Amino acid sequence: VVAPILHGKNGEDGTIQGLLELAAIPYVGCGVLASAACMDKAVANTIMDAYHVPHCHWCSAVRAEAETQRSTLLTRVENRLPYPIFVKPANAGSSVGITKAHNREELNTAIDTALREDDKVVFEEFIDGQEVECAAIGNPDNPQEVRTTRPGEILAGAEFYTYDDKYKN
């Protein structure tokens, strides 16, 4: 049995899970579809919207729009979300490529930062409050049984929980 304890592209996006399934190798964790859907922040937000799960306001753009219609994109994002705005690559983990933009100039630069990691960019509203994390662990033999870990508070060293906060500090 494989425990795919991997981060980021190819590790938690369904790629390794799909490879393991093709090779008929049992593994623990989420399957291909759940992994892929949760790795892509735009897809995950769309699913949460469809099921009326409360979460931050958001919008997204693809590289072509960001490169050919930048001014229109900036205006669309500003009309949808108040500053500060989190700008994220849709398919990256560990806070890689994430920027907290406080104005139009920072928003413009943040789009370029996110595009270095992915071809799709997600924009999310900033929500001021306590941030906690908790894992939910399902049981495939009994889908009604779900256990959770104890919640832990995230204490960011900077304005948000950065890569350095997660792995270096």
Question: Where are these predicted regions, by residue range?
Answer:
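Phosphate-binding site of ATP-dependent enzymes
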Residues: 102-169
